């Protein structure tokens, strides 16, 4: 190649002879880097392996020539002198084609062609090798990837040449010299410019389609690999698009596919529970279809404290009504004279004050009987002290009846002490049964004294002492219940509180609540 160039040197003149030296060095340096048809072309990439462009460094795909332009600003002057020397050797003006009028680099090759034809070179020689040049250009057009990968090294090696390194004409000239060193690229200048523009457009399109789509495929690759052919269809279309040189149509369908797949991967139960929990904490309604679950939870959360508050209000109301009802629960029989009621009013008030807190069992049982289906039974388990002034107040009303009342109280206390061991066996009874037993015993005790009074023929005069005795019996029975409860609590081990509703057996209770008729 060097010998042929030396042989052509006398006929070409000084400019062309000085130009071939650097091109020879460039071809030697780039010869090992140029790919062949079976090494890097797309014909060998149709297999299962990935495209070779994706294995390169992306920074070398588009070389940055700004540094070379800044370092060699004087190459433009050399090119101008070079073109001027070529013009001086021309005997007549040269007609430049319309396509090459906008490119100053092509003007150099055209005028050099005319100079060689005028000096006696064979004009048909370039046309003989034009088939090889077009074949090489077609090969360069088919695999544009090696041109992108090795463009940095080409531009770096052209740095020492006399021509401008950023001249795009150097690429086509280099490809022509590679096919045949003797063939000159001057005859195919117009075809080279068209091919060069096509190469640039294809390179830009390939960068936009392959590189950018590679980034999106890498992003959607881990998610689409799990799902089968539905998710592989967009990526397969993206790979086949650069091969067929057709623009992509399906990238807008990528985000909906990804969003649907991400929605399928979610656990909707956990999301609903978390949204409901967030609404309970923040007090805001959950958006969308979750509002019914959140409202259901809010209703449940409201029902629990509202029911609790309502129950506590009912308990407080019951306590207040018990304290009020204990004052007016017991009434005197209808056939009792008015003077007897006034005489016994003091003892009744004293017994109510002392026994209103100690014995709410019968009054509560009467109140619960009025409410037929009451769900709760309240029993007062507080320990109460035995009043000391009960017997003096109760016996201070009449001097004639004081001895009888004391005897009845002593008998009632003795009966209660005798029945207290047997009452411990009734601990297994429920509170309601105990209250019913007390109420039944109390009603029997109040009904027995009225029977002799109704049988007597002497109505008015004989009725007054008996009614008085009946009223005293009711008052004494209430005091006996209080005393019996206190004596039973005193006998419990370790001071354990005991419900006031614990009563002895029916026989013992009847004996304790009903004194003998001889004492009346």
Curated annotation (Swiss-Prot):
InterPro entries assigned to the protein according to its UniProt record, in alphabetical order: DNAAF8
Annotated Gene Ontology cellular component terms: cytoplasm; dynein axonemal particle
GO biological process: outer dynein arm assembly
Modified residues (Phosphoserine): 161, 351
Localization, UniProt: Dynein axonemal particle; Cytoplasm
Keyword Transcription regulation: no
Primary location class: other
Reported tissue expression: Expressed in respiratory ciliated cells (at protein level).
Residue ranges, compositional bias (Basic and acidic residues): 111-125
Disordered as annotated region, ranges: 93-202, 217-256, 328-366, 388-520
Key word Glycosyltransferase present: no
Compositional bias annotation for Polar residues: 420-437
Swiss-Prot/TrEMBL keywords: Cytoplasm, Phosphoprotein
Listed GO MF terms: dynein complex binding
Compositional bias annotation for Acidic residues: 401-410
Pfam families on file: DAAP1
Function, as annotated: In cyliated cells, dynein axonemal particle-specific protein required for deployment of ODA to the axoneme. Interacts with outer dynein arm (ODA) subunits.
Name of the protein in its database record: Dynein axonemal assembly factor 8
Origin organism lineage: Eukaryota, Metazoa, Chordata, Craniata, Vertebrata
Gene: DNAAF8
């Amino acid at each position: 190649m060097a010998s042929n160039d030396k042989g052509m040197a006398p006929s070409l003149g000084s400019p062309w002879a000085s130009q071939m030296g650097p091109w020879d060095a460039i071809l030697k340096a780039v010869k090992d880097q140029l790919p062949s048809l079976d090494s890097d072309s797309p014909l060998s990439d149709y297999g299962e392996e990935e495209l070779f462009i994706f294995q390169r460094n992306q920074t070398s795909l588009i070389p940055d020539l700004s540094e070379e332009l800044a370092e060699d600003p004087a190459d433009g002057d050399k090119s101008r002198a070079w073109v001027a020397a070529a013009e001086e050797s021309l005997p007549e003006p040269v007609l430049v084609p319309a396509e090459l009028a906008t490119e100053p680099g092509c003007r150099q090759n055209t005028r050099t062609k005319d100079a060689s034809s005028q000096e006696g070179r064979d004009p048909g020689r370039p046309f003989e090798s034009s088939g090889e040049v077009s074949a090489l250009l077609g090969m360069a057009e088919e695999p544009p990837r090696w041109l992108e990968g090795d463009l940095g090294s080409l531009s770096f090696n052209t740095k020492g040449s006399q021509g401008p390194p950023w001249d795009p004409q150097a690429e086509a000239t280099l490809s022509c010299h590679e096919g045949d060193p003797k063939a000159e690229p001057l005859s195919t200048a117009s075809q080279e410019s068209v091919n060069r523009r096509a190469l640039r457009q294809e390179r830009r399109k390939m960068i936009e389609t392959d590189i950018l789509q590679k980034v999106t495929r890498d992003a959607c690759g881990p998610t689409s690999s799990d799902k089968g052919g539905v998710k592989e269809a967009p990526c397969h279309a993206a790979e086949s698009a650069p091969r067929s040189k057709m623009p992509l149509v399906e990238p807008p369908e990528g985000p909906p596919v990804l969003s649907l797949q991400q929605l399928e991967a979610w656990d909707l139960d956990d999301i609903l529970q978390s949204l409901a929990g967030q609404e309970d904490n923040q007090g805001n309604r959950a958006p969308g279809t979750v509002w019914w679950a959140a409202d259901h939870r809010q209703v449940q959360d409201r029902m629990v404290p509202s029911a609790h508050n309502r129950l506590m209000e009912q308990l407080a109301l019951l306590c207040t009504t018990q304290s009020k009802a204990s004052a007016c629960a017991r009434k005197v029989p209808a056939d009792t004279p008015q003077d007897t009621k006034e005489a016994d009013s003091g003892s009744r008030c004293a017994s109510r004050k002392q026994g209103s807190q100690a014995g709410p069992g019968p009054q509560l049982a009467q109140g619960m009987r009025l409410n037929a289906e009451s769900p709760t039974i309240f029993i007062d388990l507080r320990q109460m002290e035995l009043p000391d002034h009960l017997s003096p107040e109760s016996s201070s009303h009449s001097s004639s009846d004081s001895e009888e009342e004391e005897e009845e109280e002593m008998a009632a206390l003795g009966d209660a002490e005798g029945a207290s061991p047997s009452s411990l066996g009734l601990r297994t009874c429920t509170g309601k049964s105990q209250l019913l037993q007390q109420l039944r015993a109390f009603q029997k005790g109040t009904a027995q004294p009225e029977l002799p009074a109704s049988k007597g023929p002497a109505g008015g005069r004989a009725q007054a002492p008996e009614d008085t005795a009946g009223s005293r019996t009711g008052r004494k029975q209430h005091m006996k219940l209080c005393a019996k409860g206190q004596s039973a609590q005193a006998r419990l081990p370790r001071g354990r509180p005991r419900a006031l509703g614990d009563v002895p057996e029916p026989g013992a209770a009847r004996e304790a609540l009903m004194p003998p008729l001889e004492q009346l």
